[in-house]
Amino acid sequence: MENILNFNEPLDINLLDQIVSVLYNPLSNKNDIKAAQMVLGKFQEHPDAWSKVDTILETSKIVQTKFIALVIMDSLIKYRWKSLPREQCEGIKNYIVSLIIRLSSDPQTSSREKLLVNKLNLVFVQILKQEWTTNWSTFIPEIISSSKTNESLCENNMVILRLLSEEIFNFSEEQMTQTKIQTLKITFEKEFSLINDLCFYILENATRASLIKATLETLQRFLNWVPLHYIIEVNGGIAEPSKLVKLLLHKYFPEPLFRNSTLKCLTEIGNLNLGNQQYDAVFIAIIDKFMNQIKFIKPDPSKIPQDYEDGDQGERSFIHTVSLFLTGFFKSHLKIMENSLNIPYLTLAHEILVNISNIDELELFKICLEYWNFLSSNLYSDIATFTTTLLSTPPRLQLYKSVLSKVRVVLIDHMAKPEEVIVVEDENGNIVRETTKDTDSLTLYESMRETLIFLTHLDSENTQHIMLEKLQTLISGREFTFQRLNTLCWAIGSISGAQNKEQEKRFLVTVIKDLLELCQNKKGKDNKAVIASDIMYIVGQYPRFLKDHWKFLKTVVNKLFEFMHESHPGVQDMACDTFLKISKQCKRKFVVLQVEESQPFINELLNQLSTTIAHLEQSQIHTFYEAVGYMIASSSDAAFREKLVNKFMELPNHSWLQIMGAASVKVESLLTVEVARDILNLIKTNNRAAMSLENCYITQISKIYLDLLNVYRTYSDHISRNPNIYRETLGQAMRSVKKETLKLLETFIEKSSDKQVIYSNFLQPLLEAVLGDYRTNIPETRDPEVLSLMTAIITSLKQLVHPEVPKILEAVFETTLSMITKNFEDYPYHRINFFNLIRAINSNAFTVFHNLHPQQFKLLIDCVVWAFKHTERNISETGLHILKELIENVSKNSDVANVFFKTYLVSLLNDILYILTDSFHKSGFALECDILRMMFQVVENGVVKIPLFDPQQANFPSNSEYVKEIVVTFLSASPNVSRPQIQAFVTRLFNLANINNNDFKSATRDFLITLKEWKSHENADLYSDEKNIEKALALKKQSMIPGMVRPNDVNLEMNDL
C-alpha cells in the first residue's frame, strides 16, 4: 500500500484502485480498512497529490477513486489556488473543462458517468469562483457559444450555470469577501442577456425533455436576482410579463410533464415584492393563469389531502410546490388580491391552503403554518390601528372571517405538544411518562401557539366556540380519542392572555368544569391520567385568572394535591411541576387571609404537609419544597415568615436531628450508604427550599450550618484516609453529599441579601472546611463545585471578601492548573469552573492580582491564554472575556498599564491573531475582534507611555508602527495574500479602531475569508452578532402583543395582590 506515497515514481493506478476497493468493500476486514484509510489519508494530504489527479481520472477503473481525486483537486482550488504559478492554474482549468466537454457531449456517456460529471461540475464552479472575472472575463460568452453546438453539452452547461448562480447569490456571504461577491453579481447581471436569450431559445424550440427540465431548473435559480426587465416588460407605460415569463405561463405550466418545474419558476417570480403599483397587473396575470389552471387540475379542493395520500412522488411534489407558490405570492401581494375582482380567486386559493394544511405531512404543515402566522399577524396589525366606525369589524377581517375560522379548526386539531406535558401516548397506544424532549415538537408548538394567539385576538368568540364545541363532542363520547382531547387541551392552554379577563373567566370555568366531569365519568387509569395531565397543563397556563379567583385557585391546588397520590407514570411529576408554576405566579395569594377563610392557606398546607407528600418520590418532594418556599418568601411580615419557615422545615429537620444525634454518640453511624443517601436527600430538600426562600432561608441554615460543615469534614477526612473509596458505592455517596453541600452553600450565598452577615458569621468556617480539603485531596476527589462556590462568594460579597481572595487563590490556583493543563479533555467541569473563578476575581477583586508574585501573575496570564485557545467553546469564550476585562482593568491605571503591556501585549497579540486565523475558534470571532481593537486602541491612544520595543534592537517611530509590523509579520505566513495586501488591511484596521466597531469587524471578516478561503459551514459564527440582534428585535416586537409572552415567563408580582 505504501508504494502510492512515493511521488518520485509513476503512480500505480491498479494499486490505488485496490486500496480504494478495500475501503468500500463491506467484506473487507477491519485491519485492512484501517490500513487503507491511513494510506489514503496520507496520499490526499501530500502537497503534490493534485499532480496525479489527471492520471487517476483518465486511467482509474472505479468511480470512488476518481471521486477521491476530485476531492484532492477541490481542496487545492479552495486553499492553495492563489499560491500556484499561473501556467499551472491555466493547465488545471483547461484539463477540467476539456474533461467535462468530453464526458457531457455524448448523451450515453453523460448518462453513464452522471455522478462523475456532477462532481466535475462542482470542482469547475470552484475554479470559476477563483478565475472569473479577473483571469477569465469571457467565460459567459464561451459557455453560451458551446451550448449551441450540442444538446447534451447544453444540458450540462445549464447545470454549471445553475451551480454558479447558487454559489454567488445563495451561499457566497460566508465564503467570499463582499467586494468579490459584488463583482461577480454585477458581471453576472451584465451578461445575463446572453443567458436569457439561450434559455428563451431552448424553451421555444427544444424537444428534448431533459434539456427543457434542466433549463427550467436553472432559470428558477436566476429569477430571484435577474434584472427586472427580464421578467417584466414595460411598453408605453403598461407593464406585462416578459416573453420568457409568457412562455412559462402559456406553454409549460399547462403541460403536466413540466408543470412542477415551471411552477417553481413562477414561485420565484411571485415572491418578488417590488413595491410599485405599476407592476401589479403582471402579478394579477400570473395568479389568474395559475388559478384558471388549478380549477381544472384540482376541481374539488377538499380532496387534496386524499390526492396527496394516494399520489405518486410527482403528485406530492406538485402539491408541495402549490403551497410554496400560494403562500409566497400572498406574502408579497396580498393587498392587490383583496380587490373585489380578485376575491373569488383569493377565497379559492385560501380554501386550497386550508386543505393542504390538513395533509398529514409535517413539512407541508410548517409551510402553511408560516403563512397563517403571517396572515393573522398582518390582520392583527390592522386591528391594532383600526378606528371603530359604524362597522364593528374591520373590512379586511370580514373578508377572511370564514377562512380564519377553518384555520383555527386546523390548528386546534393539529396542536403540537407543549413542554410541560409529560404524560403521553406511546406508539402502542399505552399512556406513559415521556422520557426525552422532542425539540422539533416544542419549536412547532411555539409557532402554533403564536399563530393561535393572533387568531384569538382577531375573533375570540369564534375561537372559544370551536374549542367548547369540540370539548362537548368529546364529553359526549363521540369521536373520543386521547389524541383529540390532548390537542384540544394544548390549544386551550396556548391562548392564555389573548382574551380579556371576563372572557377568560367564562371560558376557563366552563373548560375545567367539563374536564373534571369527564375525569369523573371516564373509567380506567389511562383515561384519568390523560385527563389529569390536560387539566394540570391548562390551569398552569392561566395564572392571571387564578390570581383573580381565589376559590378556583384553592380548588385547583387541592386537585393537584389529589393528583400527587396518583401512581400513574408522569401524573405526580406533572402535579408537582404545575404546583411549582402556580406557586411562583400566585405566591402572595397563599400567605394572606382570603375572604371567607379562617386562616391563610399556607397554614392549612403546612399542617397537612406530611399527608400531601406521603406518596411522592424524593425528587418530587424537592420540587414541592421549592414551590412552598416561594409562597413563604412572599409574606411581608418578617415574624410570620420566620414562623412559617420553622413549620415548613419541621419534617426534614426532624430527620436531620435524628441522624446528627446518632452521630454525636457514634460518628461511624454516618459512614453507611443508607445514612449518606438520607443526608443527601435532606440537603437537596434544603437546597430547593433555599432557592425560593432566598433571604429568609437564613432562619433554617442557622440551625444546621455547623452540623452541615461537620458532615462535610467527616466525609472529607474519610475519603482522604481511604483515597480509593471514591470508586466504591459508599465513597460515591459521600462525594454526592459533599457536592450537594457545596451547591446548597452556593445557593444560600447567592440568594441572601445580607452579605455582611454572611461574611461575619458564615464565611470563615466555610473556607476552613472546604479549601484545605480541596488542596490536600487527590485530583480525582476534588470537587469542581468548590470552584463554583468560590466564584459565588467573590461575585456576591465583592469588596467584603477581598481579604480572603489570596487564601482562596492559594488553595485552588496551582492545584487546579496541575489538573487541567496536561491535556484538553480531563476534568471538564473543573476547567470551566476554574476560569469562571478567575473571571470573577478579575471583575470583582482585580487589585488582588497586583499582589501576586511576577511568576504567579505570568502563570495567570498563561492560563488565560490556555483557556481562550481551548477548543471547548465555553472555556474559550470565558478566556476571551477574562482577557477583555483584564485589558479594561489594566488600562485604568497608567503605571500598571505600562508594566503589563510592556511585558505581555506582543505575546497576547500573537495569541489572539493565532486563534482569529485558525479553524477552531470562530465562535469567539466577535470577542476576538473586540480584543484586537482594544489592543490597537492601547497603542493608538497613548495608553502605554513607554516603548513596547527595545530601542537597542529596533527603532520604530511609535508603538503603533511597531504593533503594525508585528501583525503584518504574523499574517505574512499565509501564501494566499501578498505583503502589500496585508499592510493595507492592517492600516485600515488601525484607522477603524477608534471609529466604528461594526466596520472593524466587517473588515476583519473579509480579510479572514481572503486569507483562508474558508468554507461556508465554518463561517456562520462570523455573523453571530448580527443574528443575535435580529433575534432580540423579534423578541421585543413579540412582547408588545398580549398573550405572546408565555404566561409563566411574565412577572406578575406587581399585580400579586
UniProtKB/Swiss-Prot annotation:
InterPro entries assigned to the protein according to its UniProt record, in alphabetical order: ARM-like, ARM-type_fold, CRM1_repeat, Exp1_repeat_2, Exportin-1/Importin-b-like, Importin-beta_N, XPO1/5, XPO1_C_dom
The keyword Nucleotide-binding is assigned to this record: no
Top-level taxon: Eukaryota
Domain Importin N-terminal residue range list: 36-102
Localization of this protein: Nucleus; Cytoplasm, Perinuclear region
Gene3D superfamilies: Leucine-rich Repeat Variant
Gene behind this protein: xpo1
HEAT repeat residue intervals: 239-275, 281-321, 462-501, 506-544, 551-588, 596-633, 739-776, 781-818, 855-892, 902-925, 926-965
Major place of residence: nucleus
Summary of subunit composition and partner proteins: Component of a nuclear export receptor complex.
Family: Belongs to the exportin family.
Protein name: Exportin-1
Function (record text): Mediates the nuclear export of cellular proteins (cargos) bearing a leucine-rich nuclear export signal (NES).
GO biological process: protein export from nucleus; ribosomal large subunit export from nucleus; ribosomal small subunit export from nucleus
Single GO term (MF): small GTPase binding
Alphabetized UniProt keyword annotations: Cytoplasm, Nucleus, Protein transport, Repeat, Translocation, Transport
An example Gene Ontology CC term for this record: nucleus
Native source organism of the sequence: Dictyostelium discoideum (Social amoeba)
